[in-house]
Amino acid sequence: MVHRQLPETVLLLLVSSTIFSLEPKRIPFQLWMNRESLQLLKPLPSSSVQQCLAHRKNFLLPQQPVSPHQYQEGQVLAVVHEILQQIFTLLQTHGTMGIWEENHIEKVLAALHRQLEYVESLGGLNAAQKSGGSSAQNLRLQIKAYFRRIHDYLENQRYSSCAWIIVQTEIHRCMFFVFRFTTWLSRQDPDP
């Protein structure tokens, strides 16, 4: 099935190429939107999506404060970390109940764990998490609430295949949110 391999491949290719490009000295990110990743981000087969249209839900991904320009670099890293952590927790908690095989989920979790460790190793993350401005802290709380709604949705839908297809789409949306922040980070001037 297409949707069994898509999340792992998207997470591995897109997140790895973007997040692993981060360096403490802010070396520009690799070009993450390459031809292969664009192919992988094609929509699910229309038959799968059409079958699940009745299950759609707006999880209210925070859209208003998504401009990274209003945050400092450490705060942006904290937001990226929060999103990756929430995706990791979602898949770790509920992934084996979904449409993917257990070994497949383990690979995705391992990749996400590496990403999280790398982001945590970057300077500025811990300080930003402790001191973060109110707008960055507010965004992190909105992200947590967003993922809580996803958790609740899966539970209410009893982890059905359609619910997982909807959640898979949401994970893709989250990754684009991450890329918006990481693209901004890559454009910052390197330290002298």
From Swiss-Prot:
Residues 1-21 form the signal peptide. Pfam families: Interferon (PF00143). Expressed at very high levels in uterus and, at much lower levels, in ovary and cervix. Very low levels, if any, in other organs. In the endometrium, expressed in the luminal and glandular epithelial cells (at protein level). It comes from the Eukaryota. Its main location: secreted. Disruption phenotype: Mutant females are substantially more susceptible to (and less able to clear) an ascending infection in the reproductive tract than wild-type animals. GO terms for cellular component: extracellular space. Keywords: Antiviral defense, Cytokine, Disulfide bond, Secreted, Signal. Disulfide bonds join 52-162. The keyword Secreted applies. Induction: By estrogens. Contrary to other type I interferons, not induced by known pattern-recognition receptor pathways. One of its GO terms (biological process) is defense response to bacterium. One of its GO terms (molecular function) is cytokine receptor binding. It is found in: Secreted. InterPro entries: 4_helix_cytokine-like_core (IPR009079), Interferon_alpha/beta/delta (IPR000471). PANTHER family: INTERFERON EPSILON, TYPE I INTERFERON. Belongs to the alpha/beta interferon family. Type I interferon required for maintaining basal levels of IFN-regulated genes, including 2'-5'-oligoadenylate synthetase, IRF7 and ISG15, in the female reproductive tract. Directly mediates protection against viral, including HSV-2, and bacterial, including Chlamydia muridarum, genital infections. This is Interferon epsilon.
